[in-house]
């Protein structure tokens, strides 16, 4: 009998030791970075990702919003979690999120998204430009770690802040999507929360695949970043330009004196075939009303130009693309061509390069045919820029198509953008991150 008791005691101690060691290992593990796979939806051209959220964990599909303020999800339908916690008025969470001192009240039984004495924000569908009020809350989020080259173990943030949206906000988003993942310049965006929780640098990189059948990637944390076949991108592989803060929010709804969470860069001029395009350069600056300038966006599928800039760029491009037959326009594009006489290169159709000249003549973002020309039918290629109208809020919006197969690093601590131009030159693509090999 004594022998049996001893055996049970030994087994119990062993089990406790294993459990304790496992828990300690999970607690002490600090990932170098994190990754999110990104897919391109063929119907909407939105860039989608997926996280695991709640308890028990469930997969949540989201539209990627580079300049979005935070993670928001639909809490009206099917949100069930034992670890959901609404943020109470005047709490540290509300202060961190910039939610102000107002207190929300709910006039129905408590549930996720509807609790008394909570603070709220304004979840924004940036595709349809629709916003509403929503409850700030925290819950468990699980994502995969990475060393910049391979995926690693899954890690959890048990107090990840997000905002509850309403079901009607999902209108216009891709099928199956339950919210939006905001990577913008706020203290509760995904990059900010991940870097704070896991103590890695406040940097993230975006590499969007041009294919609807292959995954691109967002990498949170510092580089180097590696793509197959062993193409490494370190700090000296990037060109750098400052990121600017627009002092006036560009969200659909916002509070006074709230700056924009989107990423603006300082384009000084535009060149085609290394020749300056004559444009009104005052449009390239942000005025005191927050109008003008250049931003980068993943919710706009194509680059959008203010009308006078669009006309100048289109006309100049047509003039430089000699001996190519122009054909009828195909909406939303104006300048379309017979592609049968346009040669192919490693970086797409052989057409004039377009340069966004940045802080000086030696720093420019060169756009090649793969990112400027859209194949709209078998024999028709169109210049993939869109007329944004006479008085848009932002003069140039660099859209998703233009940044596909470009590696962009957003350094939040130093407020700068690192960019590579097309990585097709390096004989790789954004679809070549090795998601299959576990670090």
From Swiss-Prot:
One of its GO terms (cellular component) is apoplast. Keywords: Apoplast, Aspartyl protease, Glycoprotein, Hydrolase, Plant defense, Protease, Secreted, Signal. Pfam families: TAXi_C, TAXi_N. Glycans are attached at residues 116, 280, 323, 434. The keyword Signal applies. Belongs to the peptidase A1 family. Involved in plant defense against Phytophtora parasitica. Contributes positively to Nicotiana resistance against P.parasitica. Binds the P.parasitica xyloglucanase XEG1 and inhibits its cell wall degrading enzyme activity and its contribution as P.parasitica virulence factor. XEG1 acts as an important virulence factor during P.parasitica infection but also acts as a pathogen-associated molecular pattern (PAMP) in Nictotiana species, where it can trigger defense responses including cell death. (Microbial infection) Possesses stronger binding affinity with XLP1, a truncated paralog of P.parasitica XEG1 which has no enzyme activity. Is impaired in its inhibitor activity towards the P.parasitica xyloglucanase XEG1 when hijacked by XLP1 binding. This is Probable aspartic proteinase GIP2. It comes from Nicotiana benthamiana.
